[in-house]
Amino acid sequence: ALNGALTIGTLDGANIEIKDAVGDDNIFIFGLTAEEVEARRHDYDPYPIYHADPDLREALDAINSGMFSPEDPGCFRPVVDTLLSDGDRYFTLADFRSYSRAQEVLARTYLDQAAWTRKSILNVARMGFFSSDRTLRGYARDIWGVPA
């Protein structure tokens, strides 16, 4: 939300704080919560999601085919391997459908320029806490032990 950009993200890490600062209506949240991820971690398998979602399967198959890197067709295979063969550590595939729905809401919101502008202005007004100046001063003082 820095510089008025609206955030789309999962409800973890800094996005929790951003959501608290800007308000539920001014951020686009998708995906599993940290608690839901933890509950599913022991038996999560990305393959059923891949096989059940034609849009996701089409996207991953296109990436894996070399379509986006004809000069080096295997260039992006490690991405697909990480998501499928290596277990999708960050639950990216589990969040895909929710992300798609959030992106549709975001796109509709963008078409309503008055609503988009209002949300952008509110984000700017409520994001002061996240300024890089404040963050770097805190890092200098608390982590690096240097004057700021």
Protein language model annotation of sequence segments:
Residues 1-129, 134, 138-148:
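Catalytic binding pocket for nucleotide-activated donors in carbohydrate/polymer assembly enzymes
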